[in-house]
């Protein structure tokens, strides 16, 4: 509890160890264009479009945005930029 209020429970969509795929280049370019807040994605991340990797870690930005690190693909990844690998 903080100031008499319970701490919100955040839940990531992709737990550590989950195989994920970075979404398409078109999606990532649109995200970079439209996203105006924390952790903008880089050109290096856009080059990783379509890559499959494993979730190394998940963290929560203030307000509940889920941010991931991947095992072999650099950058901090927004949950909406990833999808389950089939």
Indicate residue ranges for each PLM-predicted region:
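Basic/aromatic-rich interaction segments and small domains that mediate binding to polyanionic partners
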Residues: 2-86
């Amino acid at each position: 509890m903080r100031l008499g209020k319970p701490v919100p429970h955040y839940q990531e969509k992709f737990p550590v160890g989950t195989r994920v795929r970075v979404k398409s280049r078109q999606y990532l370019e649109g995200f970079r264009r439209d996203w105006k807040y924390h952790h903008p994605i880089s050109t290096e991340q856009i080059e990783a479009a379509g890559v499959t990797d494993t979730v190394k870690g998940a963290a929560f930005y203030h307000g509940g945005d889920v941010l991931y690190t991947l095992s072999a693909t650099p950058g901090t990844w927004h949950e909406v930029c990833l999808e389950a690998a089939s």
